[in-house]
Amino acid sequence: MKGINNKQRKQLQLKAITMFFAVLLLSACGAKKQLVKDNNKVVAVNNTTTAPQVAKKENSEALLKLAFIQKVADTKVFNDNITGSMSFSLNTGNKTINLPGSIKMRKNKVIRLQLFIPLLGTEVGRLEFTPEYVLVVDRLHREYIKGDYSQIDFLKTNGLNFYSLQSLFWNQLLLPGQNNVTESDLKKYDVKLAADNASQNIITFSKDKFKYEWKADKTDGRISDVAVQYNSADHGTSLLTWKYNNFKSVGVKSFPAEQEFQLSTNAMQKQKQATIKISMDEVKTDSDWEERTTLSDRYKKIEAQDVLGKIMSAGF
């Protein structure tokens, strides 16, 4: 070039090289590459592949969660009847009662606990749940409490009805306000997948005033623990925990012969807590029994609201 000395020529070449590298950098940005510092090393990350990989990982985790919930749901027994003799224990903090008894449950029909005098075998009390009502019978004093679920304080203030109680007694998942859990309902739950060295995953569900948590075995899906928290602006906070042990074979499935549930609540003016433990001698599927209790005119009906107080005072 005329009129350009060597120094100017070198400057022009340097500018051209600089522009060339600038174009390369812009091209790199156009390809959506960015530099990430990782442990003081510079690593190239390609965004065009990262997003699909993340989506694939999230989708894979969601499928794992759904498959586990399905496994838990599939553990329920097929039989319509669960029966057996039992040992019944009630602890209210300042009083403990241990009595023999029996349990009879018919799916979607009734849950019945009967308590007997030791050795004699005479029935002293009965607690019966049906879809329509709750019945508590005191055989010794010939008194009974009967009311629907809105009339029974400790059930109403804890958001419990027959179907939620049935799910708890039968060692199954539940959804508040629903009679059962369908296949399409399974996606409503979330799962906290445990680490490889842990034995249980945690299933959770929250809605309005309810918080539910189930602990279930990673391998067979069997539920071992349930926690139900109910928060009410009018009635305070209640916590129900339910534990299952000593599973017995019922057909191709299994059923917990030992159940322990604890209710703590401040919903009735003062803090109350009760722990009930049921230990079945064996788990049967007998169907030859009446599903509804009938009482003679000799029994006197008393106030329905304080049924928990009646149970906890163990008047029978």
Short names for language-model regions:
Residues 3-18:
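Bacterial N-terminal signal peptides that target proteins for export
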Residues 25-28:
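C-terminal motif of bacterial Sec signal peptides marking the signal peptidase cleavage site
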Residues 30-95, 304-316:
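N-terminal leader/targeting segments and the immediate start of mature chains
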Residues 31-35, 181-300:
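Gly/Pro-enriched, hydrophobic low-complexity segments
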Residues 66-68, 139-210:
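Flexible, processing/modification-adjacent segments and terminal tails
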Residues 73-82, 92-97, 104-106, 127, ...:
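Edge/loop elements at the starts and ends of beta-strands within beta-rich repeat scaffolds
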Residues 88-92, 117, 263:
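Transmembrane beta-strands of outer-membrane beta-barrel pores
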Residues 110-163, 167, 301-305:
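An acidic-aromatic
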